[in-house]
Curated annotation (Swiss-Prot):
Domain of life: Bacteria
GO terms for cellular component: cytoplasm
Organism: Rhodopirellula baltica (strain DSM 10527 / NCIMB 13988 / SH1)
Pfam families registered for this protein in UniProt: HCS_D2 (PF22617), HMGL-like (PF00682), LeuA_dimer (PF08502)
Protein known as: 2-isopropylmalate synthase
Catalytically driven reaction(s): 3-methyl-2-oxobutanoate + acetyl-CoA + H2O = (2S)-2-isopropylmalate + CoA + H(+)
Family: Belongs to the alpha-IPM synthase/homocitrate synthase family. LeuA type 1 subfamily.
Amino acid sequence: MNQSAEAPSSENVATRQIRIFDTTLRDGEQSPGASMNLAEKLEVASALVDLGVDIIEAGFPIASPGDFESVRQIATTIRGATICGLARCAEKDIDRAWEALKTAPQARIHVFLATSAIHREFKLRMTPDEIVERAVAGVRRAASHCDDVEFSPEDACRTEHDFLCRVVEAAIDAGATTINVPDTVGYTTPGEIYDRFKMLRDRVPNMDKAVLSTHCHDDLGMAVANSLAAVDAGAGQIECTINGIGERAGNAALEELVMAMKTRQDFYHCQTNINSKRLVPVSRLVSKTTGINVQRNKAIVGRNAFAHESGIHQDGMLKERTTYEIMSPEEVGFTKTDLVLGKHSGRAALADRAKQLGMTLTGEQLQEVFEAFKELADKKKEIYDGDIVALVQQKISETVAPEWTLVDYEVTSGKNQTPNVRVTLRRDEQDITEQVAQGDGPIDAAFWAVEKITGIQVVCKDFRVRSATLGRDAIGEVNLEVEHEGKTYRGTGVSTDSVESTILAMLNAINRIVAGIASDPGELPQP
């Protein structure tokens, strides 16, 4: 492994192209609470194409009817990337995956089968010979449908070297064009994975007929480091997710991998097709869609990633930016100027700013966002980028025509007074209903009032409030998860008033209940 303290010379070293395989819609969605509905998956898939990913793993078609339909719709409508579906090494899985993928101009079937001794003995109860036989049959079945077949020996990083080489060689002979080596439980280390990839390249005689891929989990916090070590050892594809979301502790973060290879091209001698200026907008979209906030100190896309508080650092930055910044905020999609618009700004200025922030609006969306923007401008002197992002994503998240809309609300509360909230709602642009409710606080009272009007009872499973911008007049964004009749629904609301944000988020979730748009990923196995 190249562990030199000094960067190696880039002279006479060819730059390799690394494929980016994004599994946000499959492995990322397995992160607890991160499930997405069809419209949200299509929006994320479109954003991934704009970002420049090479392969989009759209889902696991046999897992549920909803997952099948998501993969089918993405395969039918999304262009500009290979669309991939996951399948176990079983005919029914593989045929179901192909049924969902067959309309895609570029389709890939990704089959997997566990190979480690612990999985063979306790999960599959199969002998090594039976594993090889099933792997070969699965790859052949997939290859009968399409030319692009990926095989993953699940838990490869805990599989004996000799047996791993045997399975990989057999899979390539059967038609696998990509061999993915998963660190399924996030157990390996950079040195170990480097040696494993080098071993496969040296010992598997037909390895040159397939692309080696890495898929690392972050249980020990080494997913990105392990993925980069695999690239250093010859991997030509990295499997990753936006913001590193995924099963348990998550997956390797796409944004960190891409910027590590870009910033240290002198070391890795690799490049990708990723447009790095789209990283922050796509990160925000996935965060908004899944309801999983990005931690402030997250590398590359966190709010503090380019913040400098130390006086020594600030002094150095003023004298020469590169003293404390190894890449520029603009390079990953942050904007130089945060303060942008005011109450006298027009539609064109709003549309232009939204585009600069990575969000293209349709005419109808622009009109809705502009109306919300003007309302906000009457409440706030200065409109920040974060305000615009919150407004746009709020409107985009409204994937169905709302049955219930907010007309008015009024809060009465005090130190020695039980909070009362009066809420007035309109249904289908016609009937107006008003209710007053009490609660442990204004937000609890607002929940009760909305439930009384709509007649829909829910259990709040998660409730989060965050400030979209700085200042005492900042927009508050509420993201909540509610349960109704055994299904989970998400809602989002933004306003300068936390009670109004809560009511809007509640209505967003209730309108999804009425429309039957649940957030339910089903059972999703993983490689």
